[in-house]
Amino acid sequence: MEFEQVLTEARLVRRYRRFLADVEDASGQQWTVHCPNTGSMLGCTEPGARVWLSHSTRPGRKYAQTWELVELPGEVVVGVHTGRANALVGEALDAGLLPELSGYASRRREVRVPDAPMRADWLLEGHPGGEPPCFVEVKNVTAAVEHGRALFPDAVTERGRRHLEVLTEWVRGGGRAALVFCVQRSDAQEVRPAEAIDPRYADALRAAAAEGVEIRAVRLHPSATGIRPDCALPVHYQEEP
């Protein structure tokens, strides 16, 4: 994924009210931008961190710029825009990084799971080998701890847990479903549930995997020019201390 424009570089002052962040340029001038991430953004909101912003020309928009990237210590760049995760997983599918989900002739976005209060991010259809259609839910991952362990979620997510339960019920009924963690940081080596943050989600993830929901993860490499698919990552179901 290439960014449509040259991103503006700034420094983070603070992130607040979930959807807002204040930034400043080298001269000290400050302004407010849109923060497209509803999580806690654990580890990604240190004041003074280098950030990159995209610009919208849409008329009437209150905040013209959107926070896209943040640089962490060690020159690790993290993509914080959760709205890009679905398209990035689509690119990862095209790049062959999720071979277990390959072979489908088409895919559709935002498709309702039958008899369930949920729209899946993707529906894969038309597998020549006879595989059933596959509902795919995408979760954006930005948090990580030492040794490259990426964690999800970074805040309690009742919605995310309900999505897992819907996918689990779909598989129990004979369907196919997958959850893909979209890890937008190049230092990640694996993905684990953040048990200390949301133990109910961790339990639901393990239950879903045991019932046959396919749990996958893909690493993306963010930079100031774009975000490219990198590699598949292993998923482990226990958070190590």
UniProtKB/Swiss-Prot annotation:
Pfam families in UniProt: SfsA, SfsA_N
Disulphide bond pairs: none
Matches recorded under InterPro entries: SfsA, SfsA_C, SfsA_N
Organism domain of life: Bacteria
GO molecular function, one term: DNA binding
Family, per entry: Belongs to the SfsA family.
HAMAP family with a match to the protein in the record: SfsA
PANTHER family: SUGAR FERMENTATION STIMULATION PROTEIN A
Name this protein carries in UniProt: Sugar fermentation stimulation protein homolog
Naturally occurring in which organism (per UniProt): Halorhodospira halophila (strain DSM 244 / SL1) (Ectothiorhodospira halophila (strain DSM 244 / SL1))
Gene: sfsA
